[in-house]
């Protein structure tokens, strides 16, 4: 049944999936999505639909788009935010201040910061995911950053790097 549901979600136009999510939230008594939340979800809908088997599963993956700052970081994700990782996030935040906000440019900037710190991209992506989403599972960090936009992404990173001080 989940396979059929996931296949159906994957084939639906993005706006119809969003409408189905809003109906689901209404039926479960959850708050309606704000305009900002809808925009963020639509911006990453392709990635969300790839993994989704059910509407609740899609909503779980879209959680990053619905939470407000400061992001509450789950215990498991907090382990990714040690002093060294926060230092790399500080460097990345500075590197992202003025560049392009395209997915490719974001990924290249992250790769440069990882290389400068002698680590692979995954060692930077984990704390980046924790800072942006507050958890260890989410869509791609670069998809999240493009959906959240420059201002919100940098603010979430700054919130976490401020905790290191």
Set out the residue ranges of the language-model regions.
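Non-catalytic terminal extensions that flank enzyme cores
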Residues: 2-29, 111, 147-165
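Core structural elements
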Residues: 2-7, 46-54, 119, 130-134
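Non-catalytic, well-ordered alpha-helical scaffold segments
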Residues: 2, 15, 42, 46, ...
